[in-house]
Regions:
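Short secondary-structure boundary/capping segments
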Residues: 22-23, 72, 91-94, 109-113
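Short, solvent-exposed coil/turn linker segments
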Residues: 4-5, 55, 76, 110-112
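Short, charged beta->alpha transition segments
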Residues: 86-91, 99-111
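Structural motif
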Residues: 29-30, 50-52, 78-81, 98-102, ...
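A glycine-rich helix N-cap at a beta->alpha junction
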Residues: 66-93
Length: 124
């Protein structure tokens, strides 16, 4: 049986809620992908998924697909957090949340040195 977090004061819930704000996203270096479609797209991409948040009654159209993608990406039960409906609504920015969201690490864009010939124009 999975533990369901219902307290809005739980550190995990507070962290997820903080990701709604720019300050929280900068502090944790992550953002929330909310909803079935966006969650599935992030799991299929090269983005680094940190944790999944699932509402206690989640049974969306793509639930089976989402859980299969989570498993494929190595996000086991230790990286899936089950929230009560009220805690999930607290974290969600949607009026009618779909019941699943993904915490994704913000990619760091490292500038690459140009390969081959390069022309740099400055002050033109």
């Amino acid at each position: 049986m999975n533990t369901i977090i219902s307290s809005k004061n739980n550190p995990i819930v507070k962290r997820a809620a903080a990701l709604k704000e720019k300050k929280g996203r900068r502090e944790y270096g992550a953002f929330l992908a909310e909803g079935e479609k966006l969650t599935a797209e992030c799991l299929r991409s090269s983005l680094q998924a940190e944790r999944a948040y699932v509402s206690e009654n989640y049974a969306g159209k793509r639930a089976e697909e989402i859980f299969a993608l989570l498993e494929k990406r190595g996000l086991g039960e230790d990286k899936i957090t089950y929230l009560s409906e009220s805690a999930f609504s607290f974290v969600s920015e949607e009026k009618t949340p779909q019941g699943v969201m993904l915490e994704v690490k913000i990619p760091v864009n490292v500038p690459r040195a140009p390969e081959g010939d390069c022309l740099i124009l400055d002050g033109i």
